[in-house]
UniProtKB/Swiss-Prot annotation:
A biological process term (GO) from this entry: mitochondrial translation
Protein name: Large ribosomal subunit protein uL2cz/uL2cy
NCBIfam families per the UniProt record, alphabetical: rplB_bact (TIGR01171)
Quaternary structure annotation from Swiss-Prot or TrEMBL: Part of the 50S ribosomal subunit.
Chain positions covered by the region annotation Disordered: 1-21, 225-254
Transmembrane regions listed in the UniProt entry: none
Keyword Ribonucleoprotein: yes
InterPro entries, alphabetized: NA-bd_OB-fold (IPR012340), Rib_uL2_dom2 (IPR014722), Ribosomal_uL2 (IPR002171), Ribosomal_uL2_bac/org-type (IPR005880), Ribosomal_uL2_C (IPR022669), Ribosomal_uL2_CS (IPR022671), Ribosomal_uL2_dom3 (IPR014726), Ribosomal_uL2_RNA-bd_dom (IPR022666)
SMART domains: Ribosomal_L2 (SM01383), Ribosomal_L2_C (SM01382)
GO CC terms in record: chloroplast; mitochondrial large ribosomal subunit
Subcellular location: Plastid, Chloroplast
One term of GO molecular function: rRNA binding
Amino acid sequence: MAIHLYKTSTPSTRNGAVDSQVKSNPRNNLICGQHHCGKGRNARGIITVRHRGGGHKRLYRKIDFRRNAKDIYGRIVTIEYDPNRNAYICLIHYGDGEKRYILHPRGAIIGDTIVSGTEVPIKMGNALPLTDMPLGTAIHNIEITLGKGGQLARAAGAVAKLIAKEGKSATLKLPSGEVRLISKNCSATVGQVGNVGVNQKSLGRAGSKCWLGKRPVVRGVVMNPVDHPHGGGEGRAPIGRKKPVTPWGYPALGRRTRKRKKYSETLILRRRSK
């Protein structure tokens, strides 16, 4: 990712950074509107997820996570910004005239060719089943259910690793550190998702975060007792408890929240690292 820094004239330009060399003019037939029913609210209008609201209006980009254009070579025409994710997207022109968006693989440039199928080269951006990949391959956009499309390792900079194949399953090490089993017939894309340094980008001011739909976060220790269990006290006081809790009194910061009886319990060989 190319990050452009401005000369210091105001605090927002002094501390902020923007991406360069990325376009933002999507094709009309590959975008659609999306329905927003209250940021962070449920059907009754009650806040279920805090710190969400506002933000700039977005158009959804239709991205090809299935990569089901088999054995048809495509060429990367543009690398574009997507407001719905941290990763960039690529516009692909296929040989049969079809145009699709895919996630931008790290290192891919305009003019590169990609293809998906069963016996395709192990090359960055190509999509193929796990059974055809050698051990140690770096992959992203991984299917969990055959034919449903990629669901794992899709964020900016995400990459998983194929570490073993045995029987009908393949063993993957996911970006979170979790090691789990997936069917060898599921497909994935070779390489790492681009825009790796997005977590090092400084927004520069609070208004830039408001454009993203994120509202301010207030610490519980500076609230009143009526608003948070950590609140109250004279001056800067500790939380007054053995362990921190949520605004509703449930244990926080360290308590495991995963449900015990899940279908994937037998597929996870090692839980994700904290």
